[in-house]
């Protein structure tokens, strides 16, 4: 999986890693619904699974 920045500005394969405005504020997966396309919130980052 790949880690992305808090601002979601890293792009993988030409596409944003997660939607604009998506930020993980929790240390767990409570905000995972804000990350789409297989990305999940973990440790305040959106990770690709």
UniProtKB/Swiss-Prot annotation:
Single GO MF annotation: toxin activity
Annotated signal sequence range: none
Transmembrane segments: none
Keywords, sorted A to Z: Disulfide bond, Neurotoxin, Secreted, Toxin
Keyword Secreted among record annotations: yes
Compartment annotation: Secreted
Tissue: Expressed by the venom gland.
Top-rank lineage group of the source organism: Eukaryota
Single GO cellular component term: extracellular region
Function according to Swiss-Prot or TrEMBL: Toxin that causes irreversible contractile paralysis into adult Aedes aegypti resulting in 100% mortality after 24 hours.
Note: The primary structure of the mature peptide is identical to that of U1-theraphotoxin-Lp1a (Lasiotoxin-1) from Lasiodora parahybana (AC P0CC18) and U1-theraphotoxin-Lsp1a from Lasiodora sp (strain IBSP 8539) (AC P0CC19).
Protein name: U-theraphotoxin-Lk2a
């Amino acid at each position: 999986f790949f880690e992305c920045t808090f601002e979601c500005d890293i792009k993988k394969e030409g596409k944003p890693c997660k939607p604009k405005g998506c930020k993980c504020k929790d240390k767990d997966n409570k905000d995972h619904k804000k990350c789409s396309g297989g990305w999940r919130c973990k440790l305040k980052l959106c990770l690709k699974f």
